[in-house]
Amino acid sequence: MRYLTAGESHGPQLTAILEGVPAGLELRAEHINKELARRQKGYGRGRRMQIEKDEVKITGGVRHGKTLGSPIALVVENRDFKHWQTIMAVEPIDDEAEVKRKVTRPRPGHADLNGALKYGHRDMRNVLERSSARETTVRVAAGAVAKRILEEVGIRVAGHVIEIGGVRAKKLDYRSLEELQAVTEESPVRCFDPEAGQKMMEAIDWAKKNGDSIGGIVEVIVEGVPAGVGSYVHYDRKLDAKIAAAIVSINAFKGVEFGIGFEAARRPGSEVHDEIIWSPEQGFSRRTNRAGGFEGGVTTGMPIVVRGVMKPIPTLYKPLQSVDIETKEPFAASIERSDSCAVPAASVVAEAVVAWEVAAAIVEQFGQDRMDLIKENVERARRYAKEF
């Protein structure tokens, strides 16, 4: 399974083409729209989310509510495009006023300058329109399709926020993934700990008041993945490596860890590795899950636990210093409409990209063409592991 996306932040639409999704999967627009609505929520979002109400159009690969096995085409309209039709026109324009609106002041922390150097753009709008986090809209749409695959084989995915602006959640004593999801869906910052959630909102308010931005840490948990998914044979087949790449590919994400993560560097081996246990009811398992569900790039059967670090959004209403690429004079960086904090929304994006990688691994390992055969093969793998 793979997907490609196309479209600019203020262009007419965003598009995703999904290849390799098995035939026979029940899929409706409402499955995807539910995830798109979750992405648009979150304390600290900017005015753009008041303009857009993201809804998907499925224009290929689905008939009568089921996937066909052919490529799936997903389209999400940018409603704000009506205000940008001249600036984002496909054909050449001769409107001098619009030409003068080109972006020549790169923003620190963005792809503006690097992208202009790479592609030879003198107007950095050509860079920022595509490097914008608006593109994650269709990545969430693709992830919604992946979640449907995982649901069919009894695999559940949940994401939540564990830190914003230095405020870290301490109360994480949820008894099930369902409880975690129920509580975080009601939290404006998608945090299970209500006391920490309140302090996170206060930190976001402070950032907004001061024209600044703050980042944080999100966690994604995947339960129900059979042992033995992924591979230790080659570096590019390790499932944890694919998930790590997917997490860091999200806009503004700068780090990733599994299980106890970087804490492993500060502990002796006896406090890092998970002891193996066995019972007639469960077969082989682990006493703990410090590895976060992976050993050697292969799933252990324990929950996958992965965290990603999101830096503060670089677009600031109190802009940092930069240099105009035309005049070479120092200026305060350009300001684009932005959020004070997008960590809650980013947890939904992280869910989506992790779901895609896990679903792709399941489809590859247990049969690529038909959903019914994949379900049979996954159940067979679970029985095999239990009886091993």
From Swiss-Prot:
GO MF, one example: chorismate synthase activity
Names of the cofactor(s): FMNH2
Xref: Pfam families: Chorismate_synt (PF01264)
Cofactor binding mode and count: Reduced FMN (FMNH(2)).
Gene Ontology annotations for the cellular component aspect, listed alphabetically: cytosol
Keywords linked to the UniProt accession: Amino-acid biosynthesis, Aromatic amino acid biosynthesis, FAD, Flavoprotein, FMN, Lyase, NADP
Catalytic activity: 5-O-(1-carboxyvinyl)-3-phosphoshikimate = chorismate + phosphate
EC number: 4.2.3.5
Recorded metabolic or biological pathway in which this protein acts: Metabolic intermediate biosynthesis; chorismate biosynthesis; chorismate from D-erythrose 4-phosphate and phosphoenolpyruvate: step 7/7
Amino-acid positions noted as binding NADP(+) in the UniProt annotation, renumbered to this chain: 39, 45
GO-annotated biological processes: amino acid biosynthetic process; aromatic amino acid family biosynthetic process; chorismate biosynthetic process
Enzyme class, broadest EC rank: lyase
Domain of life: Bacteria
UniProt xrefs under SUPFAM superfamilies: Chorismate synthase, AroC
Binding site for FMN: 130-132, 251-252, 296, 311-315, 337
HAMAP family in the cross-refs: Chorismate_synth (MF_00300)
Subunit details: Homotetramer.
Free-text function comment from the UniProt entry: This reaction introduces a second double bond into the aromatic ring system.
PANTHER family the record matches: CHORISMATE SYNTHASE (PTHR21085:SF0)
Family: Belongs to the chorismate synthase family.
Descriptive protein name: Chorismate synthase
Source species of the chain: Geobacillus kaustophilus (strain HTA426)
Originating gene: aroC
